[in-house]
A protein has these predicted regions:
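Acidic, histidine-bearing metal-coordination/catalytic regions of metal-dependent phosphoesterases
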Residues: 1-84, 99, 103, 107-136, ...
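A short, conserved beta-strand element in the Rossmann-like catalytic core
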Residues: 92-93
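Short, intrinsically disordered, charge-balanced linker/junction segments flanking boundaries
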Residues: 302-317
């Protein structure tokens, strides 16, 4: 049961280039470095400052509690003296779907957002941070759902189980090759369908200056977009680098040798074993009464196991 898959590295790179209009003539003419930014909060030159680091924040609400809300509450204790938050990836589980941004990110971290007192009114692609949360892409932010599972319908038990599994945290859209993340956090320049609008935007928001030229000016509470899927900035005399490691390491193919054949057969066997494990878990899950607290808690455990099994299958493939 292949519920998730990871797009090819060349696809990830090309799609992200299109979204930020990489090397567009209007950008090149202005000498803009699309991999740099400055944080304009009036304090960026101070030598003493603190920041927080989080990651893997994308889990959803579980029985009677929301893990990310509990994390956010702890972070709020340090927010007054904190300049920004670094996010190390996996913003949304399991496949970076836009439909989970309200419940898994906007609502639990609402105090960090402008207008956070009414999180239901904040669109995932229109977030502005009062306290910067500077993100990077995790593998889950690139994952997708096969098209056949978006269109398939039917009354069979197998399909009902699959639909219930989708209801966990997979959704029906996937990340669309990282598009949801890009619209949520990046300066999505592809949205401008007229060059004069693009140039006006560049002249307004790309006024920062670094040794490499002009760059995006990140202004908390006003304009809080990131320039690219990877970027750098300097704060308090320290250089920070955010990388997209999803596009760096492409595993070598298994060689066409006797040893390679053994390895390939072992992986196929492991994949078949995972299919059996998934089916057994779904059968167990189908017997649970989610109105029962003990069963609801057990469902959380089964959901986590299913997610891990799907990640292993993605790695195998």
């Amino acid at each position: 049961m292949d519920l998730i898959f990871d797009p090819a590295i060349p696809v990830k790179i090309e799609k992200m280039k299109q979204r930020v209009q990489w090397k567009h003539q209007s950008i090149v003419q202005r000498g803009i470095d699309q991999t740099s930014m400055v944080i304009d909060d009036g304090k960026e030159d101070s030598e003493e400052f603190s920041f927080m680091v989080i990651g893997d924040s994308g889990t959803t609400c579980q029985y009677e509690h929301h893990p990310q809300r509990e994390v956010a509450k702890l972070m709020l204790q340090h927010r007054p003296e904190c300049r920004f938050v670094l996010h190390t990836g996996d913003v949304i589980y399991t496949v970076g779907s836009r439909e989970y941004y309200p419940s898994n990110f906007i609502k639990p971290y609402r105090e960090f957002l402008k207008g956070g007192e009414n999180p239901q009114n904040i669109a995932y692609d229109n977030m502005v941070f009062d306290t910067p949360i500077l993100t990077t892409l995790g593998n889950h932010d690139y994952y997708d759902v096969p098209l056949k599972y978006r269109a398939i319908t039917g009354p069979t038990l197998k399909l009902r189980r699959m639909f219930r599994y989708h209801d966990f945290e997979i959704g029906w859209f996937g990340s669309e090759q990282g598009d949801a993340y890009a619209k949520a956090f990046l300066d999505y320049l592809a949205r401008f369908n007229q060059q004069e609008k693009l140039e006006s935007h560049l002249d307004e928001h790309y006024t920062g200056k670094t040794d490499s030229g002009r760059c995006l000016r990140y202004e908390p509470g006003h304009f809080t977009r990131l320039p690219n899927r990877y970027y750098t900035f300097r704060y308090g005399g320290i250089d920070f680098f955010a990388l997209d490691s999803n596009t760096i390491n492409d595993p070598s193919p298994i060689p066409a040798t006797p040893q390679g054949d053994i390895r390939r057969k072992a992986l196929i066997q492991r994949r078949d074993e995972i299919d059996i494990e998934e089916q057994q878990i779904l059968e167990e899950y189908d017997k649970l009464n989610l109105d029962n607290p003990k069963d609801a808690e057990k469902s959380d455990t089964l959901e986590a196991i299913l997610s891990q099994l799907n990640e292993i299958k993605v790695d195998i493939e």
